[in-house]
Amino acid sequence: LNGVLKLLDTLTTKSVTLDPALVSLIKTQAQQFLATLQPVAPAPTTISNTIIPPAPRTLPLTVLFWEGPIARAYLATLKSMGLKPDKIIHLVSKNDLVTQKPIGRFVPRYFKLAYAHSRQKNSIHYWSSTLQKNENTLYRAMRSTIENGLKFPPSVIDDALALVELSEYSPHIETLMIDNLSDNVLHEYLSKLQQTQILFTGGGIVPTKLLEIPTLKFIHIHPGHLPEVRGADCVLWSNLMMGRTSATCFYMAPGIDDGDVILASYLPPLTPRLHIAQRDIKTLYRATYAFFDPWVRGFVLRQALIETDGFTRISATPQVEATSVTYHFMHAQIQHAVFSKLFADI
């Protein structure tokens, strides 16, 4: 269904003549199907943060920091537990994230890094900042759900949104300017690291050459229960197909969300209280990835840290490929169905 709806959009964009009756039939049938769709199976028992947390300390962990809501949620979560990664590798893009053109070609060399970082930070957090100002009711509804449903204190969320200096989270900060994650500068730097675990925070698809560095293990939090909910927009697909938000902490391997699982879990019920009938789908989608998705991941990161004593006692389990399902970016009509079920109308 997702593919058919996307195909209709593509054909319309290319000005291909379509039978209006057929288009109407497809959209009507899709709407009826989505209205009656039931989750594949009842979600298993959820986890809760009830185990004694690890003692406050510096962890043998390196954070590969790519500025954004996810990275900020991770660092705020670690800090709230009294934990600090041994090192943060701060990745700064040489190129504008929108135009992909080089940044600061005429800026003096000694200003270039700070300028590039400022541009990157402003670009990535644009929607978070804008929605807090222009869609405050929506922001507050999502924030309240995170605070009450996932038990993140207001101070932790405030810390993530403050965008403070990275030195607040780790004693050692290294900064690299790169074109992208395939940049040889990054590969050469990581290849020289002592044996460690890398907490990945985003920035694109991790190239195989990085995952194959023998001294490193990359840890990722995926917003879906692996291997049943793989791919893109899984914070939405998990709600639609499984009836519950979920996430998985795992060791990365080449492939889409491949690798041994450290912790996979369905989360407590999350239902923001807000009337959304007249709200724009794009706004709801942007708010989901600014305020909801990062803390879904942060919740499972927190539990994984608790259950593995700060990633020092890990027993990872291979994924069962027979149960794997890969999802793709969700069409707006399906998004509408998900948001209608996710939000509690008031």
Cite the ranges covered by each PLM segment:
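One-carbon transfer enzymes
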Residues: 9, 19-346
